[in-house]
């Protein structure tokens, strides 16, 4: 007996393991001599950065820094800022790590700051470090059979298979001037960066990424009136990422995550602090897919032998959409009771969101947290935290039972309008990148064995008369009488695999 089963594969990204670890941040800081005494702490912020990720065997190690920034009013009535870095290193061990791509994210959970004296600060905080390890899960299925008298029923599905995933870290840095129109720098208060992809091109296992890194810096000006200034600078991103099997037909989903950002002030030729030295550590996370039409065997039997087959529920993914979109989020913030006269600065502290599929729309809904540095009518500087809700909707033509949708959101801009009635209209621009997958579950045969030692007894009758009802499937009739669907169609001059009206059929012997 000559029997052959042809196989194919469906593949998807699988989370092999995930672990969240806590990294406490505790320090006692004494002000350097060049900074004046503390009168009142306005805001203490803790920003977590991952500078390097190393994988060795079944261990992945993440090194990073918790950057503390304390904004305070001095005893001389001036706005001051103190910065200090707290290095940390954490590792995670799991047997699955060795064969996975590992992604490490750090997030500030909380930070508390207390002025022990005019020159000492007691700070306690916590950073959560999440280790996520991803692999490409592959499942074999039967796509065709020949020999052994085996008959198969197949269906064709469009499948978006994962070819591979990769991660690469790189640095973008530049020294630039703040511009003649702006006053010189006294101290940097905070810096924020966003990386946006403008174009990608895949050729023979390599992907060229072109984009922009925008760095925004808030600083205290070298003036006598607590003046805050903002400067913005854009740097090009040009990187090549190696991804196995990536080509001009592959679908490449890329996320640029800024894992570390350092901005420092430098003197120009005249000795004034008018230069900024900015350096960003960026990690490019790439997933590569390919869409193809695939034949899958959903039922099988042999007219000659007994067979054993394994029917397995299998998730089939189809790419419905891949997009990058810009959305402007608007919210009205209540400032009643704050006696606010003007706003010195508004910054985005974080975005929390959930995703869902509502009828024919994708929905992202959540809250945007903002920090406000204000000046009261009595000329007192204060700090406030506020948040507002936002929604993003996108119409889609879904092709599956359920949807997988994991957006990547980057804040690309913000501004505000202070109203007369103790309210502030905040506007935050976000860039949303996402791939939208529809998922269907199909019962397919993943294994089949023909038992040549158990032949079937042939039918004694050359023809069998069967009275079929409208809507019956020729495949089911053929399987029941152990013959082939092609012979039934040929014998009865049928036009397809469905009985269109109540009739008498002649069932030939196989």
Each language-model region and where it sits:
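Interfacial loop/beta elements and low-complexity acidic/Ser/Thr-rich segments
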Residues: 1-458
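Primarily a LysM-type cell-wall glycan-binding module
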Residues: 452-490, 495-510
């Amino acid at each position: 007996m000559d029997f052959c089963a042809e196989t194919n594969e469906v593949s998807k990204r699988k989370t092999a393991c995930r672990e969240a670890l806590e990294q406490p941040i505790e320090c006692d800081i004494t002000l350097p001599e060049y900074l004046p005494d503390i009168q009142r702490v306005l805001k203490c912020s803790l920003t977590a950065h991952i500078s390097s990720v190393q994988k060795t065997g079944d261990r992945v190690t993440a090194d990073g820094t918790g950057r503390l920034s304390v904004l305070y009013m001095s005893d001389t009535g001036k706005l001051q800022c103190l910065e200090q870095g707290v290095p940390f290193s954490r590792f995670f061990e799991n047997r699955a790590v060795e064969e996975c791509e590992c992604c490490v994210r750090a997030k500030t959970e909380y930070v508390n700051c207390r002025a022990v004296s005019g020159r000492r600060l007691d700070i306690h905080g916590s950073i959560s470090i999440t280790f996520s390890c991803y692999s490409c899960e592959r499942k074999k299925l039967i796509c065709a059979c020949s020999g052994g008298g085996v008959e198969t029923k197949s269906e064709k599905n469009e499948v978006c298979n994962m070819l591979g995933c990769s991660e690469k870290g790189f640095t973008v840095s530049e020294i630039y001037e703040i511009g003649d129109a702006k006053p010189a720098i006294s101290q940097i208060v905070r810096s924020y960066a966003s990386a946006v992809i403008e174009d990608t091109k895949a050729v023979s296992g390599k992907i060229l990424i072109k984009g922009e890194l925008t760095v925004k810096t808030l600083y205290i000006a070298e003036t006598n009136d607590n003046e805050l200034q903002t400067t913005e600078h854009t740097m090009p991103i040009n990187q090549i990422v190696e991804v196995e099997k990536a080509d001009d037909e592959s679908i490449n989903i890329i996320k640029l995550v800024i894992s570390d950002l350092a901005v420092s002030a430098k003197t120009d030729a005249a000795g004034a602090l008018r230069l900024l030295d900015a350096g960003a550590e960026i990690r490019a996370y790439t997933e590569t897919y390919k869409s193809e039409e695939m034949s899958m065997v959903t039922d099988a039997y042999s007219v000659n032998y007994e067979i054993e087959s394994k029917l397995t529920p299998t998730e089939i993914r189809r790419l419905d959409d891949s997009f990058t979109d810009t959305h402007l989020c608007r919210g009205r913030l209540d400032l009643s009771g704050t006696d606010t006269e003007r706003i010195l600065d508004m910054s985005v502290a974080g975005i929390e969101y959930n995703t869902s599929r509502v009828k024919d729309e994708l929905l992202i809904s959540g809250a945007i947290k903002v920090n406000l540095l204000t000046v009261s009518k009595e000329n007192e500087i204060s700090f406030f935290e506020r948040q507002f809700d936002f929604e993003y909707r996108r119409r889609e033509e879904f092709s599956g039972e359920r949807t997988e949708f994991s957006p990547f959101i980057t804040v690309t801009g913000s501004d505000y309008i202070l109203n007369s009635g103790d309210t502030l209209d905040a506007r935050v621009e976000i860039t949303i990148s996402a791939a939208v997958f529809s998922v269907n579950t199909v019962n397919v045969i993943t294994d089949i064995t023909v038992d040549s030692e158990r032949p079937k007894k042939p039918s004694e009758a050359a023809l069998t008369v069967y009275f079929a009802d409208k809507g019956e499937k020729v495949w089911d009739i053929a399987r029941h009488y152990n013959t082939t669907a092609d012979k039934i169609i040929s014998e009865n001059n049928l036009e397809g695999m469905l009985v269109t009206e109540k009739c008498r059929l002649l069932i030939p012997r196989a």
